[in-house]
Amino acid sequence: TFDASNQLATSLYNPVAHGRPDWSARAISGNSLSDPRLTNKIQLRSLAVGDTMGFMSDQLLVTVGARHQTLKITDYAYNTGTRSSSYDQSRTSPMAGVVYRLRDDLSLYANYIEGLAQGETAPAQNNGQPVTNAGQSLSPYVSRQKEIGVKYDAGGTIYAATLFSTDKPRGLIDGSNTFVASGKDRHQGLELTVQGEPMRSLRAVGGITLLDAQQRSTGSALTDGKRVLGVPKRQLSLALDWDTPWVEGLSLDARVVNTGSFKTNSANTLEAPGWTRLDIGTRYLLDVQGKLVTLRARI
């Protein structure tokens, strides 16, 4: 059960202990965890066609294509199970890419792609007050992504640098406490990656992403031009995969991810610190009746 109407003088940044309050008339229930009610249904169908053409003895490769998508979204009320909103939209979107080989080991590339994507879902509350359209999805939108980059193959070690830009509609809660689409979030950045085999049986992939994510056309001086909440300015990653010499088919892997600090509200008055995560795992390949089976474990 969730209740957004009872307000207590506390916060995550300055917690104060309180006794359990009574449920208000606006409390909503997700029902039993063993038999939960349906609250959202999403159906996506997609069909894509494309072709790559070579020119100048394949020094220049051009790929063009299109993708037809049908996206159906239906939302249901928590307490009653009745349908609260639905969308059924279709679109045919273009995609294109170009690769130009300056040398056998050096290439320039660029691509552009559009696609139909699900809109954001309205939160249950805002500043302790229930949102009028809680749980409802915004209308599907068209995502657009542009990339341009360079790739260099230094005898098995591949270096790449990519500039990218993406736009998506931005959801916000208006003066009537209703979640609506207003403005857009623009993500622009630079991604640097390197991958190769520094020693026999050891594969490595590492990179850094520098991000400039801004809120645009929000209609408010408090948020326009501010950083998108939850998006750090930088992210580092390193992944290693090693084939062990003592057991054939057994591999060990590890991945480290580090991010910078990020804003936790649209006005950028609150900030959360960066974090580091370590993932480790193992993979074992074995033959089962003539078929290769992969067993994985990860923490």
Placement of each model-derived feature along the sequence:
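Membrane-embedded beta-strand positions of outer-membrane beta-barrel proteins
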Residues: 1, 51, 62-64, 96, ...
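Short loop/turn motifs that connect adjacent beta-strands in outer-membrane beta-barrel proteins
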Residues: 1, 55-60, 103-105, 155-156, ...
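Surface-exposed extracellular loop regions of Gram-negative outer-membrane beta-barrel proteins
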Residues: 2-9, 15, 72, 95, ...
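Signature of Gram-negative outer-membrane beta-barrel scaffolds
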Residues: 2-106, 116-119, 133, 207
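Residues that define the transmembrane beta-barrel architecture of outer-membrane proteins
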Residues: 41-45, 88-92, 142-146, 153-155, ...
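Residue-level signature of outer-membrane beta-barrel architecture
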Residues: 52-55, 98-101, 140, 150-152, ...
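Gram-negative outer-membrane beta-barrel transporters
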Residues: 57, 158, 163-167, 181-266
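Conserved C-terminal beta-signal and adjacent last beta-strands/turns
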Residues: 110, 146, 229-299
